[in-house]
Amino acid sequence: MASLKELRGRITGVKSTRKITNAMKMVAASKLRRAQMQAEAARPYADAMRRMMAELAMATRGEDAASLPRLLAGTGKDQTHLVVVLTSDRGLAGGFNANIVRSARQLVDTLVSEGKTVRILPVGRKGADILVRHYPEMITDRLAGSDGKDVGFDKATDIGSRIATMLDAGEIDRCTLVYNRFLNAMTQIPVQAPLVPLSVPENDNAAPDADTAQYEFEPDEATLLTQLLPRNLQVQIFSAMLESAAGEQGARMTAMDNASRNASKAIDRLSQKYNRTRQANITNDLIEIISGAEAV
């Protein structure tokens, strides 16, 4: 049985831990509000950009893939896939990083089983550390995440430039972005979003979207595609990074709230054990005193 001194030390230690987890929960909650506002503000722009690019791309159907921009049609082959994985630089966020890495590994394993060549570009230290252990020969580079700071568009520009450079050099044929889409503080959904080639609706007879139907393109669609495809790639990556940042803070706030609750329960259990031990010691002392008095 643990002594009273040991139990007091354990209670003090758990209380100190609870102070830390409570503080981290409050910090994550304050960051979550800002990150959520940024992610929600970026969604309409990214969605509108995606619809407009799909409208432009539909005008190029039937053309030879070799004559189209590679960011639109890829290289015309389906052999080498680049998988960009967005995770965080910091831990203590529950299953946030584990879930996205699991989704990325499922995608990579599926592609490998189909005989594809896979290259991985991890963004964020936590995901990179895991992926390097499982696929050391597939890692092309390791990029730092936002490290808890506001996500900058320059990071999305850098990632987009790397993808475009690899595509132009013929090093990859397709690219998929794996990230956590933010729903709320408790829910983040792993998403596998194709970046290259550009996703275009398959149904030629589908009614045009109310927004995209109003577009009139000047100059011609091909010229606009060449100019806008790099920007669209950057916008989609930036939007995903904002979603990931909001999801990270939501997951961390939830994890620290659960940790604080568990710490409180542990303190209650230890306090009960401490009181029972103290009462038992007092009872034993009384028995010894009474027994001694009777002996006299």
Swiss-Prot record:
GO-annotated biological processes: proton motive force-driven plasma membrane ATP synthesis
- UniProt xrefs under SUPFAM superfamilies: ATP synthase (F1-ATPase), gamma subunit (SSF52943)
Q: Which GO terms describe its cellular component?
A: plasma membrane; proton-transporting ATP synthase complex
Q: How does it sit in the membrane?
A: Peripheral membrane protein
Quote any Pfam family the record assigns.
ATP-synt
The record ties this protein, via CDD domains, to: F1-ATPase_gamma
The record's principal subcellular location, in a coarse class, is: membrane
Disulfide linkages recorded for this protein, renumbered to the chain, are none
Superkingdom is Bacteria
- Spell out the InterPro entries in the cross-references: ATP_synth_F1_ATPase_gsu (IPR035968), ATP_synth_F1_gsu (IPR000131)
Keywords noted in UniProt: ATP synthesis, Cell inner membrane, Cell membrane, CF(1), Hydrogen ion transport, Ion transport, Membrane, Transport
Q: Which GO terms describe its molecular function?
A: ATP binding; proton-transporting ATP synthase activity, rotational mechanism
- Tell me where it resides: Cell inner membrane
The UniProt similarity line reads: Belongs to the ATPase gamma chain family.
What does the protein in this record do? Produces ATP from ADP in the presence of a proton gradient across the membrane. The gamma chain is believed to be important in regulating ATPase activity and the flow of protons through the CF(0) complex.
Please give the PANTHER family that the UniProt record associates with this protein. ATP SYNTHASE GAMMA CHAIN (PTHR11693), ATP SYNTHASE SUBUNIT GAMMA, MITOCHONDRIAL (PTHR11693:SF22)
How it assembles, according to the record, is: F-type ATPases have 2 components, CF(1) - the catalytic core - and CF(0) - the membrane proton channel. CF(1) has five subunits: alpha(3), beta(3), gamma(1), delta(1), epsilon(1). CF(0) has three main subunits: a, b and c.
The protein's name = ATP synthase gamma chain
